[in-house]
Amino acid sequence: MYTAKIKQSFQLLALIAVVTFSLQPVLAFDNSNGPDLPGDCSSIAVEEGNKLSFHAYARGVQIYKWNALTSMWDFVAPAANLYAEPNFFGEVGSHRAGPVWESKSGSLVEARRVQGTGCTPDPNAIAWILLSKHRTEGSGIFSSVTFIQRVNTTGGLAPTLPGLQHGEIKEIPYTAEYYFYRAENPNSN
């Protein structure tokens, strides 16, 4: 009797899991454990022929500057630390204007946003985006990066209230995950 109840409980849990995951639209692009993307984020999928090489967690700020001429906050730059662990432990590098990601060992990648990409699963956070390598320097974790995905963002949006004076700077906290990819066959890119 007790074994039958345990079996029924596990069957119920399995059914709940199947129903829960089947109701969430997810695009599963197999880039060797890259992120699962919501259905409306297909534009940030990485091209075939690339594989995941590194995954980092970022915590920092998005910097904005008030432009009194346009009455808008202009994006200036990111400033964040990169971590190996989701609890922001094990600092491995930094992220700054360029945009540039630099490892503590000295390798870096500068990238550009791929035009026409991006999605906003959370309207209260900066967009998820796809970037392609512009240049790399040094040897290490970023030396052969071809693409970068920014996903699972929180915060970072421009302020909603106007600035008090032209040139005023605001730093808005944000977190994100960055997935770094390399070509499966480096000689093909």
Predicted segments — roles?
Residues 2-13:
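Bacterial N-terminal signal peptides that target proteins for export
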Residues 4-5, 21-22, 71:
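Short, flexible coil/linker elements and helix-boundary hinge sites characteristic
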Residues 13-22:
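Bacterial N-terminal signal peptides
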Residues 23-28:
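Sec/Tat signal peptide C-region and signal peptidase I cleavage site
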Residues 29-63, 70-189:
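Primary mode marks residue(s) on the alpha4-beta5-alpha5 output face of response regulator receiver
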